[in-house]
Regions:
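Short, conserved secondary-structure segments in the cores of folded domains
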Residues: 122, 127-128, 193-195, 307-308
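Sec-dependent N-terminal signal peptides
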Residues: 4-16
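Boundary regions of SH3-family modules and the immediately adjacent low-complexity/disordered segments
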Residues: 21-108, 112-114, 118-123, 133, ...
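Second-shell loop/turn segments in exported
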Residues: 122-125, 230-234, 252-261
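...with weaker cross-activation on analogous glycine-rich loops/strands in unrelated enzymes
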Residues: 131, 282-347
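Low-complexity, Gly/Ser/Thr/Pro-rich intrinsically disordered linker/tail segments
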Residues: 344-383
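Active-site nucleophilic cysteine motif
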Residues: 257-286
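Soluble non-cytosolic domains of exported or imported proteins
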Residues: 101, 126-129, 237-241, 260-268
Length: 383
């Protein structure tokens, strides 16, 4: 869907003049960093981590016995043992290193690019954790036995990344990033030089004038970009209309488990949207269900719709087992939802969709186990 950029940026401009905190970003991020497994406050990450702690992190991802194929070929015990041995557990040190991603890359469960699947030609690669955008800060915790992979901590997950996709930097240069003024990508797939940046990406800027930002690329090169080119000063103040326009622009994009092909699954759709506003949500739907205030949990149909009727659109989430849905507000006598979905009920979608809960016969109230919101209640907001 085409975004009217002029109207979109006018909306962002006036949102950024607002002082009403609909989302308490600082408190929310602090809770995520301190309570949600896999999330981390990278700005205050220590220069050293005990070896025993690193070992536990590396061993946490045991081999899933349901995985029967590697690159569509039957897997065997020798292959599994080689994958596990490449984690290099005997060479763990306490020293952490620091870096930034050079380009869009993939974070893996094991130090290999091989696809690990339950069945042949399975679209879901269990080795794929997540896409990571360019210029993301990462903590380098460990190196694989073959020397080709780094085990990293990002703000939203841990896993293995190809070492050639990471710039090593000094601790001081790493820390400087967090105190540097940044822009944020507010529409999808913005090209800068040879790199593609997805929505929510944050990029340091060196200077700006009336028409251009001078941005610092991961390789320290400088690029001048027009201010209307999908960019805004970070963070954008939360506004439901901005969220709506962004989600509408992604409708019909392919569903993509773990972002392996550069698109989104259900949880990355939610995470990327709120990164624009400065919220560092966790990466998977189960962890996202632990963030915010619970406004409904395993009730009946009537209480489900009462809760939605009172909920704030676009910062309220409906949770199913293994799935998260964004609530988009009321539409006459119905209720709108947005989600990236492979299959819903008996229908295969494989894309980002907008639906009506009632008229599209979703029966969502019988499938959901929780509704949460990350918006402040109106009495807790201030002008």
């Amino acid at each position: 869907m085409f975004i009217n950029l002029k109207n979109f940026f006018i909306l962002i401009f006036f949102a950024n003049l607002s002082y009403a905190e609909i989302i308490d970003i600082s408190s929310l991020n602090h809770y995520i960093y301190t309570h949600i497994e896999y999330s981390a406050d990278l700005e205050h990450f220590p220069a050293n981590t005990e070896k025993d702690i690193k070992k536990r992190l590396l061993e946490k991802e045991s081999f899933d016995q349901r995985i029967k194929f590697i690159n569509n070929q039957p897997i065997n015990s020798t292959i599994i043992e080689n994958l596990l041995q490449n984690r290099n557990l005997s060479a763990i040190t306490s020293v952490n290193h620091f870096g930034f991603t050079k380009k869009r890359s993939n974070i893996k469960m094991f130090p290999t690019n091989a696809a690990l699947t339950y069945k042949p030609d399975d679209k879901i690669d269990r080795n794929q954790y997540s896409l990571i955008e360019p210029f993301e800060p990462v903590i380098i915790l460990h190196t694989s036995k073959d020397g080709e992979w780094f085990f990293i901590q990002t703000f939203f997950t841990r896993g293995w990344i190809n070492k050639n996709d990471v710039y090593n930097v000094s601790y001081n240069n790493f820390k400087r990033y967090f105190n540097t003024k940044k822009i944020v990508i507010v529409r999808d797939r913005v090209k800068m030089g040879d790199l593609i940046f997805g929505a929510g990406s944050r990029i340091p800027i060196e200077d700006e004038d009336e028409q251009y930002y001078t941005i610092i690329m991961p390789d320290s090169k400088r690029i001048r970009l027009k201010k209307d080119d999908g960019l805004s000063i970070f963070p954008v103040v939360y506004n439901s209309e901005i969220a709506k326009i962004f989600l509408e622009s992604l409708l019909n994009q392919p569903y993509d488990w773990g972002g392996k092909n550069g698109y989104r699954d259900c949880s990355s759709l939610v995470m990327d949207l709120f990164r624009i506003f400065g919220v560092d949500l966790p990466r998977n739907s189960r962890q996202q269900a632990e963030v915010g205030d619970i406004i409904w949990e395993r009730g009946d149909k009537k209480s489900f719709f009462i809760a939605l009727g009172k909920a704030e659109p676009f910062c309220t989430f409906i949770h199913m087992k293994g799935h998260i849905i964004l609530y988009g507000g009321k539409d006459k006598d119905d209720y709108l939802i947005y989600h990236a979905v492979e299959r819903f009920g008996n229908i295969s979608y494989n894309k980002v969709v907008k639906q009506h809960i009632i008229s599209d016969n979703t029966n969502l109230w019988s499938k959901a186990y929780r509704i949460t919101t990350i918006c402040r209640s109106k009495e807790k907001r201030y002008d």
